[in-house]
Regions:
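Short Cys/His-rich zinc-binding micro-motifs
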Residues: 8-18
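Short, surface-exposed charged micro-motifs
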Residues: 11, 84, 112-114
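A short, polar/proline- and glycine-enriched secondary-structure boundary/capping micro-motif
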Residues: 34, 104-107, 133-137
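Surface-exposed, charged secondary-structure patches
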Residues: 72-108
């Protein structure tokens, strides 16, 4: 059950229903690091919303991380829906939809994302074409 956001802290960008300070805010500020792939994905969405380039780079696998700059963060993100997630021991999958505004038109990004443990921390690796079987890997 999610905790409603209070007036003391705005609601989290990831649409969890929790206050930002008790959700992705602790990750974006460096106070903590997400311990699940879904929490990492939600925090990365919040980083895209707020333009937090250092956080995005830190949470992207070094083998697949592109060169990012502030021009890559101009999209106006509207909301996030986690469709489903599967947490493995070393690999995890999160499927989500993220809505954004393109001019006057609202569009949705639908992605199945691969996350892996790298140096004992979850990192985003890449989008996948379909749901793989990850078992306990």
């Amino acid at each position: 059950m999610s905790t409603p956001a209070t007036s003391a802290s705005p609601p989290c960008h990831c649409c969890s229903g929790k206050p930002l300070a008790q959700c992705c805010g602790i990750y974006l500020s460096g106070q903590a690091y997400p311990n699940t792939a879904e929490a990492l994905m939600r925090s990365r969405y919040s980083a895209f919303v707020t333009g937090n380039l250092p956080y995005l780079t830190k949470t992207w696998h070094p083998d697949t991380c592109p060169e990012l700059n502030s021009d890559d963060l101009t999209t106006r993100w509207q909301r996030l829906e986690v469709v489903k997630s599967k947490q493995g021991l070393k690999k995890s999958i999160v499927e989500f939809r993220a809505w954004f505004t393109d001019g006057d038109t609202e569009r949705a990004l639908h992605e199945i994302s691969l996350f892996k443990l790298h140096k004992k921390r979850w990192v985003y690796v890449e989008p996948l074409d379909k749901w793989p079987s990850i078992g306990a890997s």
